UniProtKB/Swiss-Prot annotation:
Interacts (via bromo domain 1) with GATA1 acetylated at 'Lys-312' and 'Lys-315'. Interacts (via bromo domain 1) with GATA2 acetylated on lysine residues. Interacts (via NET domain) with CHD4 (via KIKL motif). Interacts (via NET domain) with SMARCA4 (via KIKL motif). Interacts (via NET domain) with NSD3 (via KIKL motif). (Microbial infection) Interacts with the Integrase protein of Moloney murine leukemia virus (MLV). GO terms for cellular component: chromatin; nucleus. The gene is BRD3. The keyword Magnesium does not apply. The modification N-acetylserine is found at residue 2. The modification Phosphoserine is found at residues 263, 281, 563. Residues 562-644 form the NET domain. The Bromo domains specifically recognize and bind acetylated histones. The NET domain recognizes and binds the 'KIKL' motif found in chromatin proteins. Residues 34-140, 306-415 form the Bromo domain. Residues 504-521, 655-673 have a biased composition (Basic and acidic residues). This is Bromodomain-containing protein 3.
Amino acid sequence: MSTATTVAPAGIPATPGPVNPPPPEVSNPSKPGRKTNQLQYMQNVVVKTLWKHQFAWPFYQPVDAIKLNLPDYHKIIKNPMDMGTIKKRLENNYYWSASECMQDFNTMFTNCYIYNKPTDDIVLMAQALEKIFLQKVAQMPQEEVELLPPAPKGKGRKPAAGAQSAGTQQVAAVSSVSPATPFQSVPPTVSQTPVIAATPVPTITANVTSVPVPPAAAPPPPATPIVPVVPPTPPVVKKKGVKRKADTTTPTTSAITASRSESPPPLSDPKQAKVVARRESGGRPIKPPKKDLEDGEVPQHAGKKGKLSEHLRYCDSILREMLSKKHAAYAWPFYKPVDAEALELHDYHDIIKHPMDLSTVKRKMDGREYPDAQGFAADVRLMFSNCYKYNPPDHEVVAMARKLQDVFEMRFAKMPDEPVEAPALPAPAAPMVSKGAESSRSSEESSSDSGSSDSEEERATRLAELQEQLKAVHEQLAALSQAPVNKPKKKKEKKEKEKKKKDKEKEKEKHKVKAEEEKKAKVAPPAKQAQQKKAPAKKANSTTTAGRQLKKGGKQASASYDSEEEEEGLPMSYDEKRQLSLDINRLPGEKLGRVVHIIQSREPSLRDSNPDEIEIDFETLKPTTLRELERYVKSCLQKKQRKPFSASGKKQAAKSKEELAQEKKKELEKRLQDVSGQLSSSKKPARKEKPGSAPSGGPSRLSSSSSSESGSSSSSGSSSDSSDSE
């Protein structure tokens, strides 16, 4: 009996209906395809890379359910897919756009995850392949452009089939994939991601040939799944309850968002639907859909670009950065609206009344629906707030949201404070202030809803720092706008000193010196105020941003953030890192707290470390962190160099007029004696004609540092001394 039972399954192919369905079509004359730059990239880069991978062999051909003795495979997997089919479709120009091809890849991986157990070797192999797939897709050209000639070329090339071996086919079946429907089940995926590194490959590869028949061989992955596969329907129901964990199963990227997924095609049975959600979250990182969205909207955006205000243009650049591949590892869950139905998050819309995502923000930005920067910031913060509200604080998607919000807040805080045009001056202040209010409101919501007190405290401190930065910017603006006035005068005075030797110009020089001293007397009060304002600015936690904004404002505000963006991404050389280390050691103790804050806010791995005992390894820090530190340290050291001047100025201002006059008299008397001695030897007649003019060289030399009151004393002193020397 037992033997008969064994034989029965082997004969299954011939008996009931478990015959392999026809493989997916690879060409369709009625459905015209085309060749685009993105499809060419998929064929020449993505498929070629994956095909050569050591884990690719199970996916070379459609799953042969009869050979592998998987009677229920086609009951569970409604849309089989494999890499060999995708390759042939690309060669035959079957696809109209790259998104269709990517959908087939997603289907293939999804089928594997649906049919097999999360711990099976084949699942780990699929995850490793999917990771590479997503990395390659992220580098695909952003705009899809049709290429004219290559259409006929594809049909002649079908050597791909020859490359596959019988053993390969068998295993392929096990991992074969179903149509593009992502799923939410498979919570264990999270733990799987690390496992990807494990290489069951050699074992499987070695036994490939034996895989089909004996379940005991290394290929048990396929065989094992078979058993669980039959009873999976009940487990599926159980998994449904774990609605939020669906996101936690992102095979390739360590990102999970219960709430972010593209709506998948309708599903026929609950099991498939469930897996779909999971797969979707795994597929979310794929950038192409995002690019498609951008491509479709670019023309409209480009046409209206000029109408965006200075601030909204900056906001648009922030949005573009958040959508860039630089942040894709943790931003992908927020690319599209949450598909609660596909992810089986039945209570999502009961809890979240105002869903928000980056594609919606982009659509509103392109449609000019934001009146100002604060409207844009409110939507972005609403998106993060929703995430904190719905997911538990220790959920991975919350950690991803925090990372992305750090990027957003840091860039938003650097918004140019004031546009170049004078009329627009008041505008920047308003958005910045309202931004603070907005962030405080969103932080309050998220704290009450999600209960993640740590993130709220961080946000509150960041808010306080941003407000202090704002004050510092305004104060330094006022201070620095006055400071440059003195520079041209010093240059003039130097020139005058060189000309003092000429008798004819002496009289003119004397008048100029007096005129300048009078001007200085007028400029002195604002200069004092500027110095006083500098003091509170130093107390502010962060002056780095302020200093940078002021410098850039002097050039072109409109282009400032572009150059800054490029600069931030530049990696540091060894010499630059060494110099930065030396500069940090030169900072006073009170400035080091800000250095630690910059590092902790930008480096998640150091966020929980003790600020008093933090160790900085410059090799492990990101280029953006190093550049931010460099800017901050430079601004601190520049201020340090300026301090002696302002300090001496304050001391002089504090002295009484009488003391100043007396000191100047003494200095002038000494210098005038020397000067008069030198002049008497070379230019006696001139001194006789104008006794008061000769000594003017002395006072003029000091005029740059003396206050206006010393002008009169110097002139009177010079006349009396010159008469004595005669």
